[in-house]
Amino acid sequence: MTRALAFALFVSLFITTNSYAQRFAASGHLASSQWSEFDGTDIGGGGRFTFMPTPTIGVEADLTWYPGEFPPDGIPFTGNRFEGLFGVTAGPRLAGFRPFAKAGGGFMKVSESSQPIVCVAIFPPPLSCVMAGGPTMAAFEFGGGVELLPTGHALLRLDVTDRVLKYPGPSLGANFETNDDGFWGHALRFTIGAGWRF
């Protein structure tokens, strides 16, 4: 009898907690990203799926596609890029909005150059020539943002983060610095979007 009562209590607590805590959101966003080693702004679009196990913690997957050649000025080394970032947000839900801090990790897949580029036959090769080969780079982001919750299930969201990319090596940088191994570069990433909570 005691086991049955304990089991029933456990199940009721689990169901009550989950019915209160489980929240999902799906949204689309416009992304504007900088690169630490190249000039120009990378513009893309994507989607985000969020699971909120508690009212203050969110677990999310953020996928973004950057369709244009990059860099926009000069000789492009890539035709498009695909980015996947997976992480957590933490912040209180207040009256009509939720400020949050966030951290995550993932990847940035750079496509090969859509047209041939001329590379000087030196070692190490220029970074743009290494990037033209289409590497997949480790990516991290740290920052924060705010969700606006105007009415019902709708949401508007703004994120500002420091995106950290692991550039491949060996390579020669724009200022002729030599990188024998891969190296990390930091740059601003900004997204704005809208979605639906359910």
Residue ranges: model-predicted function:
Residues A31-E37, Y66-D73, M108-E112, V164-L172:
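Sequence/structural signature of outer-membrane beta-barrel proteins
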Residues A21-Q34, A101, G185-A187:
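Transmembrane beta-strand segments of Gram-negative outer membrane beta-barrel proteins
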Residues I117, L165-K166, D181:
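A beta-strand edge to alpha-helix "cap/lid" segment located at domain peripheries
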Residues R48-F140, L148-R157, G185-F198:
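Gram-negative (and chloroplast) outer-membrane scaffold detector with strong preference
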Residues I15-A21:
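Sec/Tat signal peptide C-region and signal peptidase I cleavage site
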Residues A8-L9, S19:
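Cleavable N-terminal signal peptides
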Residues M1-F7:
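Bacterial N-terminal signal peptides that target proteins for export
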Residues S32-G47, P135:
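Surface-exposed strand-loop-strand hairpins of Gram-negative outer-membrane beta-barrel proteins
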